[in-house]
C-alpha cells in the first residue's frame, strides 16, 4: 500500500487532455477527487508543452512534454516512453489506469512485468472512430478487433462506461470487461439555473434556442447541428443555435453558417463551468450528433440542467438519455424531426424528465464502480451490487 493511510497509489495516464478539452478532462478530475476522498493517492500523468508537477484537488498531476498530434487541434500525446517508464518505476504504483488504448497500450505490458494490476478505460470505440474518419464499416470492424484483442490481452481489466461501448470487446470474446458509468455534478448542473434573460440574449428574437456543446472535430459531427438548424428554419421553426466548443473545424463551420445566413453564435471554448451550466439550462434543446460517443458527459450535464437532448442513434447516448431525450439517425432531417418531437411536449414535462434521468448518474456511484474495477473498495462495499437503474 503506497498511499497515505493505507490507501492505494493509483497512477492514471491519459492522452488527448488539454485545458480546453471537455468530457475526458472532467471525468479525470472528478474520479481523482473521488479516489482521494476514498483514502487513495491518485497521480495523473498527462502530456503538455512544458514539464510540471503540481498538487490539485484531484491529487498529484505530473505533466510530461509531449508533441502535438497533427490535425487534432492541439491534442498532445505521451510519446517519450523512456521518460514515462522511468516515472512509473519511480512512482511504484499499486494500480495503473490508462485512458488511451493506442500510444499508451505498452503500459499494460509494463504493469504485467511489474506485477501491478492494470485497467484500461475505453473512452471511445475504435471502430466508431474509424468510421467517422471514412473507413468502410467492415474494414473498421476488422481493424478494431485486432486493436482490441491486443488491448484486452495487455490489461488486467477493460472498463467501459456503457453497454454500447462494451460491444466491441464482447464481439472478440474478451472476458475481462467491466462496466463503470460516469457521473454528473447535480449541484452545479441544475434546472434552477435557467434564465429567461440569458435565453433571450442568445436566442436573438428566435422562438427556439438550440445548443451544441462539443469539440469541433470530425468525429463529433458538428456540421449536423448546422444542417438540422437549416432544416428546422425551412420548416418554419424559428430557431437559433449556440455552439460552445472549439476545434479544427471551427473556421469552416463559421463560414458555412455565414454563407447560409443561419443564426449561429460561436462562443469558442467556455472555460467557466458555471457559465456553461447557465447556458445548458437556458437552452430549449441540446444536440449531440457525435456517432462514436461512448457516454457523452455534456449531454448528461444538459439533462441535469433540465434540458432534453437529441442524440445520435449510432452512439451510446440513447442508453444514457433514456426516455428523457430523443434519438435520431445520423441525418439533419432526422435531428430536426427529433427536435420538433421534443418541443411538442409541455416544457415542464420534458424538463422534469431530463432532470430525473440525470439523477441516476452520480459521481459517487461512478467512483465506486471505478474503484471496484481496481479491487480498491472495502470488502463490504465491494460485495454491494450495482444499482439496477445504472445497469439498464
Over which residues does each language-model region extend?
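Conserved donor-binding/catalytic core segment of Leloir-type glycosyltransferases
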Residues: 11, 203-230
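Donor nucleotide-sugar binding/catalytic pocket of nucleotide-sugar-dependent glycosyltransferases
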Residues: 46, 62-65, 141, 145-194, ...
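Nucleotide-sugar donor phosphate/pyrophosphate-binding loop at the beta->alpha transition
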Residues: 79, 117, 128-150
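Short alpha-helical donor nucleotide-sugar binding micro-motif in glycosyltransferases
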Residues: 152, 269, 277-283
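Nucleotide-activated donor-binding/catalytic signature segment of Leloir-type glycosyltransferases, i.e.
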Residues: 251-270
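Aromatic "clamp/platform" in nucleotide-sugar-dependent glycosyltransferases that forms part
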Residues: 291
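Short hydrophobic beta-strand element within catalytic cores of glycosyltransferases
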Residues: 308-311
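Conserved acidic donor-binding segment of nucleotide-sugar-dependent glycosyltransferases
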Residues: 323-333, 340-346
Amino acid at each position: 500500500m503506497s498511499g497515505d493511510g493505507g490507501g492505494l497509489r493509483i497512477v492514471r495516464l491519459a492522452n488527448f487532455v488539454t485545458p480546453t478539452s471537455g468530457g475526458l478532462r472532467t471525468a479525470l478530475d472528478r474520479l481523482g477527487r473521488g479516489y482521494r476522498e476514498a483514502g487513495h493517492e491518485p497521480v495523473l500523468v498527462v502530456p503538455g508543452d512544458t514539464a510540471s508537477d503540481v498538487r490539485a484537488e484531484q491529487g498529484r498531476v505530473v505533466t510530461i512534454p509531449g508533441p502535438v498530434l497533427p490535425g487534432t487541434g492541439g491534442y498532445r500525446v505521451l510519446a517519450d516512453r523512456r521518460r514515462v517508464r522511468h516515472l512509473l518505476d519511480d512512482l511504484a504504483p499499486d494500480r495503473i489506469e490508462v485512458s488511451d488504448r493506442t500510444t499508451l497500450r505498452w503500459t499494460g505490458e509494463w504493469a504485467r512485468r511489474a506485477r501491478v494490476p492494470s485497467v484500461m478505460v475505453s473512452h471511445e470505440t475504435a471502430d466508431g472512430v474509424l468510421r467517422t474518419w471514412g473507413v468502410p464499416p467492415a474494414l473498421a470492424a476488422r481493424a478494431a478487433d485486432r486493436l482490441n484483442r491486443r488491448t484486452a490481452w495487455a490489461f488486467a481489466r477493460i472498463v467501459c462506461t456503457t453497454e454500447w461501448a462494451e460491444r466491441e470487446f464482447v464481439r472478440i470474446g474478451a472476458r475481462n470487461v467491466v462496466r463503470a458509468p460516469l457521473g454528473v455534478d447535480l449541484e452545479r448542473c441544475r434546472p434552477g439555473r435557467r434564465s429567461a434573460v440569458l435565453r433571450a440574449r442568445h436566442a436573438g428574437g428566435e422562438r427556439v434556442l438550440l445548443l451544441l456543446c462539443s469539440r469541433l472535430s470530425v468525429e463529433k459531427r458538428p456540421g449536423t447541428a448546422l444542417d438540422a438548424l437549416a432544416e428546422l428554419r425551412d420548416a418554419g421553426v424559428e430557431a437559433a443555435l449556440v455552439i460552445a466548443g472549439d476545434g479544427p473545424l471551427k473556421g469552416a463551420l463559421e463560414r458555412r453558417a455565414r454563407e447560409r445566413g443561419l443564426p449561429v453564435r460561436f462562443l469558442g471554448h467556455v472555460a467557466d463551468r458555471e457559465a456553461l451550466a447557465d447556458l445548458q439550462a437556458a437552452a430549449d434543446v441540446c444536440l449531440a450528433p457525435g456517432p462514436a460517443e461512448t457516454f457523452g458527459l455534456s449531454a448528461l450535464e444538459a439533462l441535469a440542467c433540465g434540458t432534453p437532448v437529441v442524440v445520435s442513434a449510432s452512439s451510446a447516448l440513447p442508453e444514457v438519455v433514456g426516455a428523457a431525450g430523443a434519438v435520431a439517425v445520423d441525418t439533419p432531417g432526422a435531428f430536426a424531426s427529433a427536435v420538433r418531437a421534443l418541443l411538442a411536449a409541455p416544457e415542464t414535462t420534458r424538463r422534469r424528465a431530463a432532470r430525473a434521468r440525470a439523477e441516476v448518474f452520480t459521481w459517487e456511484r461512478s467512483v465506486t464502480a471505478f474503484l471496484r474495477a481496481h479491487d480498491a473498495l472495502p470488502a463490504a462495499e465491494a460485495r454491494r451490487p450495482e444499482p439496477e437503474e445504472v445497469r439498464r
